[in-house]
């Protein structure tokens, strides 16, 4: 389960970052299994208004997941599970969406693991062909479209609206 405040960066996702020092649990919800930091299971379930779930098996060290591969949520590509100390237990799921072209922590950890740095945004603030069907949309507008598509696909466990500050070019907004 990844937690993101910047839905428009999902086309640039190349990795999911865990913390190797944390324990992670397999959580069964209905017929699906999800992985998240053991210490955050209750807060994730509460935030997503999920009452019926089961922790299956014993927790596993985040380090055990290092370099595993996963399928991108909607693009025809795979990503890599990597480890970073910037992943905390303060909020979220302990599994961080990582897009090296969008943020200092993401860039640095992507460099460490030689993960591709994908920037599917042009100089005008619109998504490029690297974003698939979202190409041509301004990043702020793409948030709504991507979220709607993820919701329709059943890929959203929950959502909360927040005000978020993100460094961007004032000319592109």
Segments from the language model and where they lie:
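Residue patterns forming the tRNA-binding/recognition surfaces of aminoacyl-tRNA synthetases
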Residues: 1-11, 23-25, 67-69, 77-78, ...
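Carboxylate/His-rich catalytic cores and anion/metal-binding grooves
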Residues: 24-69
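Short acidic/polar mixed-charge low-complexity motifs
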Residues: 32, 75-78
């Amino acid at each position: 389960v990844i937690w993101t405040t910047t839905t428009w960066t999902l086309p640039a996702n190349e990795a999911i970052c865990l913390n190797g020092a944390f324990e992670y649990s397999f959580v069964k919800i209905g017929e699906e299994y999800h992985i998240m930091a053991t210490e955050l299971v209750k807060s994730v379930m509460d935030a997503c208004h999920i009452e019926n779930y089961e922790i299956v098996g014993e927790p596993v060290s985040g380090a055990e997941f290092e370099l595993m591969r996963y399928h991108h949520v909607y693009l025809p590509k795979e990503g890599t599970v990597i480890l970073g100390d910037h992943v905390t237990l303060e909020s979220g799921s302990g599994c961080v969406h990582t897009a090296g072209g969008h943020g200092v922590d993401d860039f640095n950890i992507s460099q460490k693991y030689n993960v591709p740095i994908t920037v599917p945004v042009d100089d005008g603030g619109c998504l490029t062909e690297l974003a698939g069907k979202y190409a041509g949309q301004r990043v702020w507008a793409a948030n709504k479209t991507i979220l709607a598509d993820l919701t329709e696909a059943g890929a959203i466990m929950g959502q909360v609206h927040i005000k978020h500050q993100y460094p961007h070019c004032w000319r592109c907004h």
